[in-house]
Amino acid sequence: MDKLQLWQRYQNWLYYHEGLGIYLDISRMRFDDPFVDRLKPKFDKAFQDMEALEAGAIANPDEGRMVGHYWLRAPELAPNDEARKEITEPLAAIADFVTKVHNTTIKPPTAEKFTDVLSIGIGGSALGPQFVAEALSSDFPPMAIHFIDNSDPAGIDRILTRLGDRLKSTLVIVTSKSGGTPETRNGMLEVKAAYEAKGLDFAPHAVAVTMPGSKMDQFAENWLARFPMQDWVGGRTSELSAVGLLPAALQGIDIQAMLAGAKEMDVATRVKDLKTNPAALLALAWYYSGNGKGEKDMVILPYKDSLLLFSRYLQQLVMESLGKETDLDGNTVYQGIAVYGNKGSTDQHAYVQQLREGVPNFFATFIEVLEDRQGESIELDPGITSGDYLSGFIQGTRQALYENNRDSVTITIPQVNPRIVGALIALYERTVSFYGSLVNVNAYHQPGVEAGKKMAASILSLQTEIQKVIKESVGSLDLVTLAEKAGDPEAVEAVYKIVRHLAANGRGVTLDGDLANPSSLKVSAG
């Protein structure tokens, strides 16, 4: 197409939300009208599926659960009074708690006020709060936030070192739906030990976000506060529940504006017309690009520093939801869309070279922010500001990709604020739901994650047996013998990696032999 034809296509496929000031442009996806017509029955079903989901249907059949994250910003739509209370009561409790923390009605035992927040959680309990903190936290928030989102001892040490003496004025939020997530438990126990090492009582500094009756709920009985998670909200869609709203509010972020923006977008994405429903349009673009099979990766390119973590947040939302081996009918399908990204225009000096000229196995999503900054910008060249350069880079990169047959979507937002961030979260949540329906997968469970957890648990059980065998043995053992004595003769490689790790950390294990030839190694206590 020439430039005028592209301009006409842009206008034909442009979506604009007047209330939010958000534009969605899918004109650089090269589908045609017959393709859209063929998908109409699938979208009709997707609209019906979403209506049933919001009415309280068991949309997660594998776990027998309702899917209710859309109710979080519209409690009146919840199917019963109990569900409505599960939304409104925690919201009121968060508002009351945050007010009391900020005005020092609630304060730590040995400091005048809480100065910092330490959020301990993983997956959806971390990625959403991290994205929102990066996007919306002010330069001088009422409380600075820090995250422990892994079981990495060095990473934990780094956070605790940064806090230093401020640990006594740090409010710790421990987030785990079941209370049994190993990484979160580990982080909590490490931090609890750090408090005790300084002679501080952990409980008056700690808050839990978990399901009522969970292991964490019971463990946190004497903590400063407990906030509930709903059974019908998954981790990757929990940012607008207590999981994300509590840490955001403590940073001074307007959580009511986030909820309002999400609610406005939800209204727009309930429209049962493809061309006037932004989430349906985005799902159409995804389906076209990957041929309904996820054949192309999704590259997220936000041209705003504060949106740096958006790609990491979307990585979990999209990949954990859509990456499924089987569909709802039990057929093996291997669905999913790989997501990665960084930020523009940094990416133009990193991997855009490959996007433009390498393997065409992706589609790009540009995120454009119209407002450059608060306040005026200086001119770097006559009539040109740094923001003009950034705008030029996004338009130029989009055109350069299109000219070499690389498709893209562009989302344009007026500015980065709580209302718009809430709307973006809602837009992508609904798009994932629509796409899940289009390809007939359960977008609300994660059996692959659970499989990994079980395998990790089996490794730790094997380690316990190995340590016992080594302690009781006289002399050294080769790896094969050690595996046999530990009760798993086929797990020689796992045994090798366990003892190598123990030896590297001075954990009572010595390795003798040629490290380049693992079969030669002898293991002994020491």
UniProtKB/Swiss-Prot annotation:
Q: What class of enzyme is it?
A: isomerase
Q: In which pathway does it act?
A: Carbohydrate biosynthesis; gluconeogenesis; Carbohydrate degradation; glycolysis; D-glyceraldehyde 3-phosphate and glycerone phosphate from D-glucose: step 2/4
- Top-level taxon of the source organism: Bacteria
Primary site of residence:
cytoplasm
Q: Which residues form the active site?
A: 320 (proton donor), 349, 453
- Spell out the subcellular localization from the entry: Cytoplasm
* GO BP term, pick one: glycolytic process
Query: Per its record, what are the GO molecular function terms?
Result: carbohydrate derivative binding; glucose-6-phosphate isomerase activity; monosaccharide binding
Q: Which PROSITE patterns match?
A: P_GLUCOSE_ISOMERASE_2, P_GLUCOSE_ISOMERASE_3
List, alphabetically, the Pfam families matched: PGI
Sorted keywords for this record are: Cytoplasm, Gluconeogenesis, Glycolysis, Isomerase
* Gene Ontology CC terms: cytosol
Q: Which positions, given as ranges, span the membrane?
A: none
- EC no. given is 5.3.1.9
Catalytic activity entry: alpha-D-glucose 6-phosphate = beta-D-fructose 6-phosphate
Establish whether keyword Isomerase is in the entry. yes
By sequence similarity, the record places it as follows: Belongs to the GPI family.
Q: What does this protein do?
A: Catalyzes the reversible isomerization of glucose-6-phosphate to fructose-6-phosphate.
The name under which this protein is listed is Glucose-6-phosphate isomerase
Q: Which organism is it from?
A: Rippkaea orientalis (strain PCC 8801 / RF-1) (Cyanothece sp. (strain PCC 8801))
What is the phylogenetic placement of the source species in the record?
Bacteria, Bacillati, Cyanobacteriota, Cyanophyceae, Oscillatoriophycideae
